[in-house]
Amino acid sequence: PNAPKYLNTPQTLLYDKSSNIFGLSQAKNEIRKTGFAVVVEGNMDVISSHQVDVRNVVATAGTAMTVNHLKALSRFSNDIRLCFDSDQAGINATERAISLGQQAGVELSIITLDQSAGQAKDPDELIQKDIELWRKSISNPQPAMEWVFDQYQKRLDISTAKGKKDFSTIALKLVENLNDPVEKDFYINE
């Protein structure tokens, strides 16, 4: 019952996981057509999504996202939407990917799985429960910086001086790393 859905292929000399994107050859035309790519964690998430005609979905093939992944995707669209699992590992992976997105010069946004669908922990589970909620979730991503701010507001008690100070310190570090001066100015004024 606690077995994984699948076991990831290990990295080898012939198979470089940091450069390969699962499902990209099947998704690239749809990514161009829709104007955005959806990146998920698992291969099953990609397969389930393609089976319900949401075909602009790819996966990082069981490895952490890299700048190489983002640069490869940016050949088809600069709008990249992340939908990693809703567990702590997925949240951590999303946070790491946001800084990589800034390095790669892509526009990242975050898809949060609609929790009204019986606590689906990944896209595959959500698709099995409610295909329309999956489509709706993809259509309503949250800008990456806003997602990060929301995460830290949940973790820190911003009703206290220490919580506000910690949040401000984290937020300023994130904003300082932004490349776009308009975006940087917007968040500084927030």
What are these regions (language model features)?
Residues 20, 42, 66, 90, ...:
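Active-site-proximal structural scaffolding
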Residues 27-30, 43, 76-79, 97-104, ...:
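Generic, well-ordered alpha-helical scaffold segments in large soluble proteins
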Residues 44, 65, 85-94, 114-120:
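Acidic, metal-coordinating catalytic cores used for nucleic-acid/nucleotide bond scission
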Residues 106-190:
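C-terminal or mid-to-C-terminal helical accessory/interaction module adjacent to the motor/catalytic core
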